[in-house]
Amino acid sequence: MRCTVIGCCGGCCRVNEACSAYLLSCQGEHLLLDCGSGAASMLQNALPLQELHHVLLSHYHYDHCSDAGALSYGRLIQMQTGAAQQPLHFYGLPVEPYFERLTMEPYTYAQTIGADDKLQIGPFCCTFHKTAHPVE
């Protein structure tokens, strides 16, 4: 498994950088952990967007999720033009109506996760736990 830091800025990204976004790659599958501001642009330095399979959102502060809509709409365009063949899957907590709008069948799907769920996402086994966030 390989982890590529796409962005690690907090709050607001700097020029040519991105907020929280970490790309996990294993066995030809790609999972993006968070996609804060600037992530959709910076991700393309590591991976063509049509090769991204999954996006896992840890929470809904903008520095962790603001580019999710761009990735969702981008996949719709990519599939309609034939640039991508597979839908993009989003995973996140069900507490935000914004998350539900990421589903645009058959292009994107949003699957909710619970605080203590265990989920197999491609080759990645993900276990979730509720934690305290310092700015909540």
Residue ranges and their predicted role:
Residues 37-87:
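Active-site metal-binding motif and surrounding structural segment of the metallo-beta-lactamase
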Residues 14, 23, 80-82, 116-118:
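Short secondary-structure boundary/capping segments
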Residues 8-11, 77-78, 131:
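Short beta-turn/strand-loop junction motif enriched in small, turn-promoting residues
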Residues 26-29, 76, 95-96:
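Short loop segments at secondary-structure junctions
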Residues 1-47, 136:
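Conserved beta-strand hairpin/beta-sheet module of binuclear metal-dependent hydrolase folds
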Residues 83-136:
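Metallo-beta-lactamase
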Residues 1, 29, 53, 88, ...:
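Nucleotide donor/acceptor-binding cores
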